[in-house]
């Protein structure tokens, strides 16, 4: 983009145009919890003024492997023994993982007593695989940062950021127009909603089949998608964008419920269906879509945990199921990177394509590789990042801070962390706009490839599997964490380089 050729006056004009477009198209956080005098307050989501330049081959590699990743994590979610083998031990030292694992066990016990017509075998995954473009003397390509299986965010507003940069190009705010490339047309909104809509259709077909077998007349209702959210949610526009797309394109109604109010849902024990009552009517729930629930603090009470179990046992399709949530833990990512683990689930070209994206990772246990990881953590910490099982940003420990953190905790707790080698991300320059004026930074980019999959956990049949667009986050090179909602990074779009 040759951003060094822009004058301060041009950057100021570009910043004003980008900021106005962002507000006009919902690229904002809402600050309902701090509104004053009854006013709603919105702040612009941090954005880049220019698209992020990503090597063509690296981007194609990341996009091409997404369907294999979708299938991989669906299979992991179905594999109780694999999850038990690698996760049960860390539940002793991680309260959140312990609670999730206990819910999973209780769900398995409850399912064993359900009648066939009360059991839901279908599951929905809305996934995001995050990468940085790694470069060394002999290699340039994508290395995976993490794989997310719950509450993947910014698929809604990322489409608007792509449109924002297109507007800047078409309206003359760039010195040189962007080159149109079909590969970077962002289908994040339609892609995610296609997956959710397919799950709704699968639910309808499944329920219709049940009623037909039992000679019960269908009630002809249109089941809904239920977004489970947190109170005072800031990222509303990202979520609402998906709701509007579901309604306008797929004619699927969505409703929202605070995780603290899950006990208001209605569970019909005879049919095992889930219902939501509003001031207007009562809706049958086809899909429960969690946009919260990935952190311990998200659950305000034991009742919220109990209701997640109740929902898990109903006929509604869950996104994600508890087993899919567990499959997305950092420990599973680390285990997959070890030799032979991946062969349990994939083979051939898919196996090789997925394996090529793995970064170097270590456990911190008493296995030979774990002992090697412990040695590296203390002797060469500057080459690594230490990751707990938690999602949401702001939880990692970097470089020289790693030995101090490990020294403060009992050694038996180290196994609940993984050690990951730094990805040598390709740097560039960009302007980040999150206040009144854009600021120029040396930056690195993280691309997140979105995917959706609907599958049958009893038969392993895949009903739908697709790559569903992308997001791009850009952060100052000196910043370790990469979360937009936590204030570390900004949203961008992608322009490809040869």
From Swiss-Prot:
The modification Phosphoserine is found at residue 356. GO terms for molecular function: ATP binding; glutathione binding; glutathione synthase activity; magnesium ion binding; protein homodimerization activity. Mg(2+) binds at residues 146, 148, 391. It catalyses: gamma-L-glutamyl-L-cysteine + glycine + ATP = glutathione + ADP + phosphate + H(+). One of its GO terms (biological process) is phytochelatin biosynthetic process. Substrate binds at residues 128, 150-153, 233-235, 239, 291-294, 473, 484-485. Binds 1 Mg(2+) ion per subunit. Its cofactor is Mg(2+). Its EC number is 6.3.2.3. Keywords: ATP-binding, Glutathione biosynthesis, Ligase, Magnesium, Metal-binding, Nucleotide-binding, Phosphoprotein. Signal peptide: none annotated. It holds the Pfam family GSH_synth_ATP. ATP binds at residues 146, 330, 387-396, 398, 420-423, 446, 475, 481. The keyword ATP-binding applies. Pathway: Sulfur metabolism; glutathione biosynthesis; glutathione from L-cysteine and L-glutamate: step 2/2. Coiled coil: none annotated. It is an enzyme of class 6 (ligase). Belongs to the eukaryotic GSH synthase family. PANTHER family: GLUTATHIONE SYNTHETASE. Heterodimer composed of a large and a small chain. This is Glutathione synthetase large chain. It comes from Schizosaccharomyces pombe (strain 972 / ATCC 24843). The lineage of its organism: Eukaryota, Fungi, Dikarya, Ascomycota, Taphrinomycotina.
